[in-house]
Amino acid sequence: MELARPCSNFQSDLDFCPDCGSVLPLPGVQDTVICPRCGFSIDVRDFGGKVVKTSVVFNKLGTVIPMSVDEGPESQGPVVDRRCSRCGHEGMAYYTRQMRSADEGQTVFYTCINCKFQEKEDS
């Protein structure tokens, strides 16, 4: 005597388990498709005529604007009151990098906005 299966919790497409709502695997060589989450099984014949389509959408590449040699990351950024040791100009742009191990401070690179001379300071 076969037991009647209780009503499903979900009314769903064949892509989803009607008991738990999980995505069902694609039919294979077995006679049934078994839900990997709850164990619900469905006969492969129920998938007859179902067509599976896949597509891959690639994002368009953005326009790349090359930076000139004078416009590197070291000549941009915030300017601090620091005197250039080469030309004496007051005001240098800076940026930081983690050059050493993580438990040590950052390295600060200063660039004179007048003569483009670079200095570095380990902090």
UniProtKB/Swiss-Prot annotation:
What are the binding positions for Zn(2+) 1 in this chain?
Answer: C17, C20, C35, C38
Q: Which Pfam families match?
A: Zn_ribbon_TFIIS (PF01096)
* InterPro entries in alphabetical order: DNA-dir_RNA_pol-M_15_CS, Rpa12/Rpb9/Rpc10/TFS, Zn_ribbon_RPA12_C, Znf_TFIIS
What ranges of residues constitute the C4-type zinc fingers? 17-38
- Signal peptide location: none
Q: Which SMART domains match?
A: ZnF_C2C2 (SM00440)
Zn finger (TFIIS-type) start-end = 80-120
Gene Ontology BP terms = termination of RNA polymerase I transcription
GO cellular component terms listed in the entry, alphabetical order: RNA polymerase I complex
Q: Where in the cell is it found?
A: Nucleus, Nucleolus
Q: Which UniProt keywords apply?
A: DNA-directed RNA polymerase, Metal-binding, Nucleus, Transcription, Zinc, Zinc-finger
Under Gene Ontology molecular function, one entry of this record is: DNA-directed RNA polymerase activity
Q: Cross-referenced PROSITE patterns, in alphabetical order? A: RNA_POL_M_15KD (PS01030), ZF_TFIIS_1 (PS00466), ZF_TFIIS_2 (PS51133)
Where, in this chain's numbering, is Zn(2+) 2 bound? C84, C87, C112, C115
Instruction: Classify the main location.
Output: nucleus
Where can the motif Hairpin be found? 103-104
The entry's free-text remark on domains says:
The TFIIS-type zinc-binding beta-ribbon domain contains an acidic hairpin motif (residues Asp-103, Glu-104) that likely coordinates the nucleophilic water and magnesium to cleave the scissile phosphodiester bond and release the mis-incorporated 5'-ribonucleotides.
* Subunit and partners: Component of the RNA polymerase I (Pol I) complex consisting of 13 subunits: a ten-subunit catalytic core composed of POLR1A/RPA1, POLR1B/RPA2, POLR1C/RPAC1, POLR1D/RPAC2, POLR1H/RPA12, POLR2E/RPABC1, POLR2F/RPABC2, POLR2H/RPABC3, POLR2K/RPABC4 and POLR2L/RPABC5; a mobile stalk subunit POLR1F/RPA43 protruding from the core and additional subunits homologous to general transcription factors POLR1E/RPA49 and POLR1G/RPA34. Part of Pol I pre-initiation complex (PIC), in which Pol I core assembles with RRN3 and promoter-bound UTBF and SL1/TIF-IB complex.
What this chain does, per the entry, is described as: Core component of RNA polymerase I (Pol I), a DNA-dependent RNA polymerase which synthesizes ribosomal RNA precursors using the four ribonucleoside triphosphates as substrates. Can mediate Pol I proofreading of the nascent RNA transcript. Anchors into the Pol I active site to monitor transcription fidelity and cleave mis-incorporated 5'-ribonucleotides.
Q: Record's family?
A: Belongs to the archaeal RpoM/eukaryotic RPA12/RPB9/RPC11 RNA polymerase family.
Protein name, per record: DNA-directed RNA polymerase I subunit RPA12
